[in-house]
From Swiss-Prot:
The modification Phosphothreonine is found at T214. Keywords: Cytoplasm, Nucleus, Phosphoprotein. The gene is GRF12. Residues 248-261 have a biased composition (Basic and acidic residues). Signal peptide: none annotated. SMART domains: 14_3_3. The modification Phosphoserine is found at S70, S193. Its main location: nucleus. Pfam families: 14-3-3 (PF00244). It is found in: Nucleus; Cytoplasm. It comes from Arabidopsis thaliana. SUPFAM superfamilies: 14-3-3 protein. This is 14-3-3-like protein GF14 iota. Residues 240-268 are annotated as: Disordered. Expressed in flowers.
Amino acid sequence: MSSSGSDKERETFVYMAKLSEQAERYDEMVETMKKVARVNSELTVEERNLLSVGYKNVIGARRASWRIMSSIEQKEESKGNESNVKQIKGYRQKVEDELANICQDILTIIDQHLIPHATSGEATVFYYKMKGDYYRYLAEFKTEQERKEAAEQSLKGYEAATQAASTELPSTHPIRLGLALNFSVFYYEIMNSPERACHLAKQAFDEAIAELDTLSEESYKDSTLIMQLLRDNLTLWTSDLPEDGGEDNIKTEESKQEQAKPADATEN
């Protein structure tokens, strides 16, 4: 196929992905953007964001289902309803299989197609952050050795992203702030290390505050919103809430979608 022909096909895929997003058909959005990602050329910012939004919604729905099922399972166990617990476990396993497949799917694309063709510092940070995120999602439901391995890979992804961000992106850049937000949640939830989580979140917040006057108009809304989420988590983590009081209120970067318009918010 000629270059112009393949460009036209790519434009068609991107348009179909946008259409799928508007129709909230995220599984189809992901399938379409996977075709673009496998072309083996660097994605544009728009293409990168479409791929990210599609996967965030596809994985987000299953993560929510898993949390609900786990909560119901605990309640049924406490009541001693063994037959119900057995049913829930089987259903939860189905969701876990879906979660694992989605994570492995995007992680393969990141390793084989996205990172090797990333030429900008921004893209490199973006993809390593995604790697950290999707291994973190695996660590949320895996157990024992598999959980340990997922957590180790998540840490490697976040560390690689952080190293690149520290030299390539200003402290106020929304992608760098989103990385700090999700990395701090990783320390809090997966590594059970609230001190590390608070230190990371506070450092990112303080560094961004110090450079706030350099913030560009185009990223002001995104950056200040993520800074607010960092501060919300710091407040939550450092307060004397009862042990069962705060988990559901922890903010990750996906929380932006609840506060800003999902259709036009810049995804990071």
